[in-house]
């Protein structure tokens, strides 16, 4: 038996499709539209109802938990909070101010104190991790490699507990991801007419717990790169969630984009 804490993005849906009917599980559905509500093993609760969540785990005699998908940082003044939530809420709010990585670490620690072990988010889906190498026909040139170096350098300088998992480097200019996500980052850059240049680097946050919240990319990410006039996408060895692999590589080859894993 495993407890699945599911948030937004297609990653939880992929896990669900793979394990349904094969594994014993239950779902804590934190999606806005309650995507998993039709599953009889799904529970809809508030992030602040920690006591209820822990009670469900104990009722199911479940000792393992898997986090997948994005959970939007809640408005703490409006969420439902139970007694155990009240006990933990001040620590959660304090850590949330340090960034997503610190908040997730605190939540993992809370479950650990309740003797519930957090497993890697790719426990059921190791095929979504990519190893080092180039996955498309197109390869980065000398200028692309300079852009890659600059983007990685900028990410390494970022605070260990912040939300930054992505950077776009183009012509010695860096655009960093904010807590609004990758899509918002793309809105900040303009396509240079008839010229392809620049790269998107998606790495985990510095010193984050790699069991949760790995950067998720896929076909939509590559389409955003193409629309922005970028040359390619750079990922970290076995530290990303890569969805739509076959379609993504086909799209990259068709549009002369590189997919590099370092």
What spans do the regions from the language model cover?
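N-terminal glycine-rich phosphate/adenylate-binding segment common to multiple enzyme folds
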Residues: 53-124
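Short secondary-structure boundary/hinge segments and terminal tails
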Residues: 21, 36, 75, 129, ...
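Feature captures the catalytic cores and cofactor-binding loops of soluble hydro-lyases/lyases
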Residues: 31-37, 42-55, 59-62, 80-92, ...
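General beta-strand structural signal in soluble alpha/beta enzymes
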Residues: 4-6, 27-28, 65-68, 118-123, ...
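Gly/Ser/Thr-rich loops at beta-strand to alpha-helix junctions
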Residues: 6-11, 70-74, 172, 240-241
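N-terminal basic/disordered segments at the start of proteins
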Residues: 1-30
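Short coil/turn connectors at secondary-structure junctions
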Residues: 1, 21-24, 61-63, 114-116, ...
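Conserved mixed alpha/beta catalytic, RNA-binding, or beta-rich assembly cores of soluble enzyme
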Residues: 11, 97-101, 107, 114-226, ...
